UniProtKB/Swiss-Prot annotation:
The gene is tyrS. Residues 352-410 form the S4 RNA-binding domain. One of its GO terms (biological process) is tyrosyl-tRNA aminoacylation. This is Tyrosine--tRNA ligase. L-tyrosine binds at residues 34, 169, 173. Homodimer. SMART domains: S4 (SM00363).
Amino acid sequence: MNIFEELKARGLVFQTTDEEALVKALTEGQVSYYTGYDPTADSLHLGHLVAILTSRRLQLAGHKPYALVGGATGLIGDPSFKDAERSLQTKDTVDGWVTKIQGQLSRFLDFENGDNKAEMVNNYDWFSDISFIDFLRDVGKYYTVNYMMSKDSVKKRIETGISYTEFAYQIMQGYDFYELNDKHNVTLQIGGSDQWGNMTAGTELLRRKADKSGHVMTVPLITDSTGKKFGKSEGNAVWLDADKTSPYEMYQFWLNVMDDDAVRFLKIFTFLSLDEIAEIEKQFDAARHERLAQKILAKEVVTLVHGEEAYNQALNITEQLFAGNIKNLSAKELKQGLSNVPNYAVQAEDNLNIVELLVTSGIVNSKRQAREDVQNGAIYVNGERVQDLDYTLSDSDKIDGELTVIRRGKKKYSVLTY
């Protein structure tokens, strides 16, 4: 099975320009290819991971990746399938995001070894040297307005309005391909399926300005089995930055994917062989309640993104919280595991009697309810049941001197911080 066949078998090929020519190029020698990442935030997220890992697979097959971070295009804003104009960011902000994103990409691609080691490029390096007049003469001349208006990403914005700034985005991305082809012999661009219009603007410029052909391959935008856009948890993006989405939160995200998605996601997001995944699928189908596919998926992706130590910590937090063993975890681990539960900062003047504190912190609405809960055995302090109405929190209840975990009933957690 050649690399293109494997990508197809994993569900990673959505659309290509001349497929026969692309397969021929990939099987006959080393291809230099690029994937672009615009800095629209200070971190990449799971939505980017499909293209990143596809780029890694091609590198492992001997091809040479260029990771383009859009220091220039990030200042403009991609209109593709966005309902409204993006807010323009300052250059200092975008530069900061570029640096962080470059650091994240270095975890997935090999920038050090072999004749196909990855290279990082920033399109600000060439756009900053082009005058507006030169850009219109040397690039804009090769695009008709009819061609630019025909792009689906533009059509969807015509009725609501699109600025010239965002309208021109596609020819900036097209010029990226031309520049990388001219300087580095890059002949293939990889990106999400929503980028097809922008990407083919590159092959158009190569054809018209340099009389060369280039290839484009898009990866699918991933949805779950219900058709919902993939990569969000509770409506929020799942980030690759551990400070924005902790390894524990990412672990839980993968652990909770639906049965109908688990095996498909193993093919897309892990480097397990297709034979290994087929074997996992057999075991998974025989006992779906054990969630084997989700557990392996969570392990593989968290280890890939954050490392083995972070995976082991996420697994330990999961197991200890499930067992109610709060005291077996550090304050740092508890902050990961309980980041989404209500939090109350204890004040110096607060009464630390359990009944008083349950009301002050908002865990219950009244002292009567608090007394009932304590007497009925529904209140736990750091995993241990408290039934004494006179119980008062002390320093021994402060985990690492930082926090106390209160549980009401089986699942309602709150964190008190000091």
